[in-house]
Amino acid sequence: MPIHDWPEQERPREKLIARGPTALSDAELLALFLGSGFGGRDAVQTARDLLQAHGPLRVLLDRPAAELARLPGLGPARSCTLAAGLELAHRYLAAELEHGEAVGNNPAAVGRYLQHRLRGQAREVFMALFLDNRHRLIACEELFHGTINAAPVYPREVVRRALLHNAAAVILSHNHPSGDPEPSSADTRITDELQQALAMVDVRLLDHFVVGEGRPVSFAERGLLSPPQPRLFG
């Protein structure tokens, strides 16, 4: 049965207007992006087929647009629509950090942004957010790229980038492609090294987020960062 013949309260668009987007299933939300069905099936059925064959939703949408375009029921136009929707979400989350408020006062927004930016990456990516003395965002950079289970991290380069941006503080993040966000012993060790290296140039490490499935793990929230140490001379 075509969607326009469904009861009005069950049609995805009308349901969203009446009850909000959280009331829709993954297939119904995806159907709104598709607009119409494929191969004699309506948009919701087509969305369910895509999720069953190529899902779940995150796995499907993490594919590059060119790969999405080759899937039955998508094609170039629909794959571009999905890619544009994801980029809008990315920019919305980035805007939470870029409108002048102190990033250090909004760890939830930082975690959401980093999760969206790093989750689903096939290889480890190590990035840094550079902040001014009021903890406002100056720049966000991907610094190192690695393999499926490791990324080389060079403290000297992190310090160099912090000085280049005249940063007063830094938030670090990397992903675990395995999906497990629990910090490894290597994560803890390199975080300690980076914190010490940054402290030598009076740059404070505010946090280190590890991104996987679910909520990112925050070193600061876990109490895994060393307390700032006074610099002694003499």
UniProtKB/Swiss-Prot annotation:
<feature type="short sequence motif" description="JAMM motif">
    <location>
        <begin position="174"/>
        <end position="187"/>
    </location>
</feature>
<keyword id="KW-0378">Hydrolase</keyword>
<dbReference type="GO" id="GO:0006508">
    <property type="term" value="P:proteolysis"/>
</dbReference>
<feature type="binding site">
    <location>
        <position position="187"/>
    </location>
    <ligand>
        <name>Zn(2+)</name>
    </ligand>
</feature>
<dbReference type="InterPro" id="IPR025657">
    <property type="entry name" value="RadC_JAB"/>
</dbReference>
<dbReference type="GO" id="GO:0046872">
    <property type="term" value="F:metal ion binding"/>
</dbReference>
<dbReference type="Pfam" id="PF20582">
    <property type="entry name" value="UPF0758_N"/>
</dbReference>
<feature type="binding site">
    <location>
        <position position="174"/>
    </location>
    <ligand>
        <name>Zn(2+)</name>
    </ligand>
</feature>
<keyword id="KW-0479">Metal-binding</keyword>
<dbReference type="InterPro" id="IPR020891">
    <property type="entry name" value="UPF0758_CS"/>
</dbReference>
<keyword id="KW-0482">Metalloprotease</keyword>
<feature type="domain" description="MPN">
    <location>
        <begin position="103"/>
        <end position="225"/>
    </location>
</feature>
<dbReference type="Pfam" id="PF04002">
    <property type="entry name" value="RadC"/>
</dbReference>
<comment type="similarity">
    <text>Belongs to the UPF0758 family.</text>
</comment>
<protein>
    <recommendedName>
        <fullName>UPF0758 protein Smlt0399</fullName>
    </recommendedName>
</protein>
<dbReference type="GO" id="GO:0008237">
    <property type="term" value="F:metallopeptidase activity"/>
</dbReference>
<dbReference type="InterPro" id="IPR037518">
    <property type="entry name" value="MPN"/>
</dbReference>
<keyword id="KW-0645">Protease</keyword>
<dbReference type="InterPro" id="IPR046778">
    <property type="entry name" value="UPF0758_N"/>
</dbReference>
<feature type="binding site">
    <location>
        <position position="176"/>
    </location>
    <ligand>
        <name>Zn(2+)</name>
    </ligand>
</feature>
<keyword id="KW-0862">Zinc</keyword>
<dbReference type="InterPro" id="IPR001405">
    <property type="entry name" value="UPF0758"/>
</dbReference>
